[in-house]
Amino acid sequence: MILNELDSFSAKLKAFAAIGICWVLLGLYLSGYWFLIKIDIPPLQTTLMTIIDYWRYYGDNPAVQKWLIICTAGGFGVPGVAAFLLIAPVKKKLHGDARFATTRELKENNLLGEKGFILGKWGRKFIMLAGQLGALVSAPPRSGKGVGVVQPNMLSWPDSVVLLDIRQESWRLTSGFRKTFSDVHLFNPVDRKRRTMQWNALDYVSDDPMLRVNDIQKIGNMLSPDPPDGDPFWPASCRTLFLGLALYVFETPGMPRTFGEIVRQIMFGEGETIGEHWKNIIEERDASPNPLSSACKAALYDFIFTSGNTQSSIRKTFTAKLELWLNPLIDAATSKSTVDLRKLRSEKISIYIGIKPADLDYLQLIINLLAQQILELNMQEMPEDNPELKYQLGWIMDEFTAPGRMPIVAKTIGYLGGYNIRPLIIVQSLSQLIATYGEQVAQTIIECCAAELLYAPKSRRQAKDVSDQLGNTTVKNTSKSRPQFGMKSGTNSTSDTPRPLMLPQEVRMLGKKRQLIFVENMNTILCEKVFYYKERVFKKRLLPPAIQAIGDYTPPPAKVSKPKPKPDVKPEAQVLNEAGQLVTIVTRPIGVEDIESIDKRSLTDYNIDFENITTPSGDPVTDEEMQAVFGSFLNSIAD
C-alpha cells in the first residue's frame, strides 16, 4: 500500500512528461533566440516556431545549416543537462561525505546576524544563535569559556538576563555596562557588608487561600524533590511538614512570612515535645476566633501523629535542609524581595547570582531554589497572550551543575523557548552533566539545545565521541606495487577509504583559539573563539562595576520561651541533720541541671530502694551473678 502519492508510478510518469514538455518548449525557444542573435535580428521576436521555420526554409543551405545545428544543439542541450541534474539521484560517496560548514551555510541558517547568543567568530563577524533557541557549552576549566562565551554575551545581550556568576567576575566586568540600560542586582546572601539583592521565595505565595497551598507545594517540591533513586518517604514527609509550617506562618497575623521564621517555629518547643507543642497550638487556635485551616492542621497532624523515632527523623531531615536560615545573614537576605522576578520579561533586569567558590557547597540549596523559581514564575504566561512580555530572558548558567540537580530544568528544557526563556548552559564536560542528571536526562538536555559548543576536550573518551559525531569522509588512497619477475614497472591502484573528519587526537589539538559548534540541521562549524578583550566593541563597554545597595533588614523579635513545668515534689520525712536541726527530706526527679554535679553527690543523696537488689552468694562470684546484681541495681534506680 502506497501512503505517499508521489511514489506511485502514475505520479512519476506525469512528472517525467511535464519535464519533457518543458524541455522541448524551452529548447525550441532558446534555439530560435540564439539563432536570431547570430543573424543580427532582434531576439525578442523569437517564438516557439522560429527555429522550425528556419529549418524548413533554409535547412538545405550549407552556410545556414551549420548555425542551425549549433543553435539547436545548444538550445536543447543546456536545458537537457539541467533537467538531468535535477532528476538524477545524488551520488553518495561510499564511506561518507562529512565536511565543515561554509559561509553560505551559516548565512542560510541565520547564524551571522546581529541578535542572539554569541557562540564564536567567523572572519570579522560573530556567530550568533538567534530566535528562541538555547545552547550548551562544554569547556574544561581554564579553557576560556568566560572570555569567549560568558563576558561577550553579558556585554551584548540586550534584554533581561540571569547569570550564575561564580567568583563575581562578570559582575566586576559587565555590571557597569548593563546598568546603562537595565536594573542590575547582585545576589550574594552571605556578603559580610550585606550588599545583596534581597529575595524571599514566599513573597510569591498567593494571599488567596484557594491558591496558597498550590504555591507552597511548588516551593516544597523545589526544596525537597523526590530522589531519582531511593525511598521518597523522607522528602515527601519534609514537604508535608513544610506545608503545615508555612500555612501556619501565613495564617498567623503579624508573623514574618519568611523561611527563617519557619525554621524558628520547628525548632521551638522548649519544655514539651515538638509534637505536644504543635498539638497545643492547634487546640489553642481552634478555641480562638482565628482557627487554622483544615489543610494546615492536616499537614501538621500528619507530622504529630507519627511515631517518636519517625517524627524525630523527619524533623532532623527538615532542619538539616533549612538550617541555612539560622544564619542571620541569610535570614536577612531572604526576609523580603527587592526585585519582582515575575517582571523579567516585561522589564530589562539583570540578576547576577554571585556566590563565591568557598560558599558554593554551603549555599547550594538557595541557588537551586532561586534558579528554579525564576523559571517557574516566568512560565505562567506565553508572550502571545500578554503583549507586555516583550523581552527575552537569557538564563545563563555558568557551572550549571554547581547548584545540584534542578528537576524543573529536566522537565521543562524543551518548552523554555516558547516562553522566551533562552538557556545558555555551561559545563566543564558532558560527563559532569551526566553525573548530576543521569544519562537519559542529560541526553534530553543536550538534544533540546539547538547548538552545542565544544572546546578542545581533555578527556580521550570525549575526544573519541566528538570524532564519531563529526563523521567520516571518503579519501582516495593510491597504492603502488613493486615490479616482480623481471617486469619493468609496477602498477598503481586507487581505492576509496574512510577517514574521520577529525581524528580524536586532532580534536584534542584544537588549541586555544579554535572550537567546534554543532548546530541542528547543518554541518559542523569549525571556527575561532571570541576574546572579548580583543574586540573593540566590547572594550568600549568595560565600565566600572555597579555598586549593590545594602539590604534592609529588621531582626525578628526574640521569642519568649514557655517556662518549664516545675517538677512535682513532696515531703517524705523530717529528720535531724548533723547540726541537730530538723530538716524535711523531699523527693524530686533528676533533672538536666543535676548532670554537672552528679559525680559529687553521695549515694545518700538519692532516694533508692536497695531491698530488691539480690546479693550474690557464690564464692567466687560468677559473671552471671554480677550481671544479675548490676541489673537489679539499675532497676532500683529506674524505680
Regions found by a protein language model. Give the residues of each.
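Short gly/ser/thr-rich secondary-structure transition/capping motifs
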Residues: 117-122, 335, 435-436
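General secondary-structure edge motif
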Residues: 11, 98-99, 117, 121-124, ...
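Conserved ATP-driven motor cores of ASCE-family P-loop NTPases powering translocation/secretion/packaging/pilus
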Residues: 413-415, 419-516
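Basic- and hydrophobic-enriched, low-structure N-terminal and domain-boundary segments
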Residues: 1-143, 147-150, 201, 472, ...
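Generic recognition of cysteine residues
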Residues: 22, 71, 238, 296, ...
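P-loop NTPase motor domains
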Residues: 3, 26-36, 89-93, 126, ...
